[in-house]
């Protein structure tokens, strides 16, 4: 069976780093947004506070989720560890553009 890159053409930016913070994968949307960062550290792309959060996520296995607005575009950022045989292998970051209006449903 051929391997399929399910993330290649989707409208979500996906960036994956190893446990040192080196980018090991970007889908097309991530590369178009940030440039090709494969093989480079993602830390210089972030402010000091964000670098500290990234280190905490890598060390403790926490997840960091928040929304931002930049140049009038709202995004949800979701950073979470990925694991290899139960050990943190690095982080995966999803950056999702949010519509101007988005319904919120409470379900029981």
Regions found by a protein language model. Name each.
Residues 1, 107-108:
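C-terminal end-of-chain micro-motif
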Residues 1-25:
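Sensory modules in modular signal-transduction proteins
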Residues 29-107:
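Sensory/regulatory domains in signal-transduction proteins
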């Amino acid at each position: 069976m051929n391997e399929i890159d399910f993330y290649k053409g989707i409208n979500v930016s996906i960036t994956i780093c190893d446990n040192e913070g080196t980018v090991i994968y970007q889908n097309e949307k991530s590369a178009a947004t940030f440039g090709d960062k494969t093989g480079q550290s993602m830390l210089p792309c972030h402010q000091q506070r964000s670098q500290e959060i990234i280190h905490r996520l890598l060390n403790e296995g926490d997840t960091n989720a928040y929304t931002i607005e930049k140049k009038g575009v709202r995004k949800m950022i979701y950073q979470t560890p990925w694991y290899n045989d139960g050990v943190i292998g690095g982080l995966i970051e999803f950056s999702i553009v949010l519509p101007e209006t988005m319904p919120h449903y409470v379900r029981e």
